[in-house]
A protein has these predicted regions:
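Short, well-structured N-terminal submotif of metal-dependent ribonuclease cores
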Residues: 1-39, 53-67, 71, 118, ...
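Alpha-helical transmembrane segments and their juxtamembrane interfaces
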Residues: 16-18, 109, 127
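Generic hydrophobic alpha-helical membrane-segment signal
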Residues: 28, 34, 42, 87-88, ...
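Short glycine/serine/threonine-enriched helix-capping/active-site loop
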Residues: 39-42, 79
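Phosphate/NTP-binding elements of NTP-utilizing enzymes
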Residues: 47
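Active-site neighborhoods of divalent-metal-dependent phosphate/nucleic-acid chemistry enzymes
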Residues: 59-63, 70-118, 131
Length: 134
C-alpha cells in the first residue's frame, strides 16, 4: 500500500520520530521497503520556506535534508498539471495551497495520506488517511 506523508510527518520522521505513532511508523517502514513511501515535491518547497522564514530549524540546508529523505527510499512525486487542477477543485477543503497539493497528490496516486493536520483529517472527501499520531 502506498503512503504519502504530509510535510510535518517527514520532518518528524527525520528528527522527531517520537511524535509519530506506532501504526504510522510501521506503515511508513513497510511502504519504504516496497518503494511505496511517497513525498510531494511541494513538501520540499514548504520545508525550505519554513527554514527561510525562521519557523523551522534544520541541522543542514534544505537541499541536504531533501537528499537525506530520498536516501531513505522515499519517492519524490512531482507536481503535475493533473495534481494542480485537482488541488484547485477539491470541494469544501481548507484553502492552504500546500495542503491542497499534498492531498491531491495522495488522491492521484491512490495513496493513504499520513497527517496530523486536523483540517485534513476532518475533511469529508474521499481520501484514505491516517492520523500520524496513531
Amino acid at each position: 500500500m502506498a503512503v504519502l506523508m504530509d510535510t510535518h510527518v517527514v520532518v518528524w520522521l527525520m528528527g522527531r520520530i517520537q511524535q509519530l505513532g506506532r501504526e504510522s511508523r510501521g506503515l511508513i517502514e513497510t511502504a519504504a521497503g516496497a518503494d511505496d513511501a511517497l513525498i510531494s515535491a511541494f513538501s520540499f518547497w514548504e520545508v525550505a520556506m519554513l527554514v527561510q522564514g525562521g519557523r523551522l530549524q534544520m541541522p543542514q540546508p534544505a537541499a541536504g535534508w531533501r537528499q537525506r529523505v530520498l536516501e531513505l527510499g522515499i519517492q519524490e512525486i512531482p507536481v503535475s498539471g493533473e495534481i494542480g487542477i485537482l488541488a484547485a477543485e477539491l470541494e469544501n477543503f481548507p484553502r492552504d495551497p500546500a495542503d491542497r497539493i499534498i492531498t491531491a497528490t495522495a488522491l492521484t496516486r491512490g495513496a493513504t495520506l499520513i497527517t496530523a493536520d486536523a483540517r485534513i483529517l476532518a475533511w469529508q472527501g474521499q481520501l484514505a488517511r491516517l492520523d500520524a499520531r496513531n
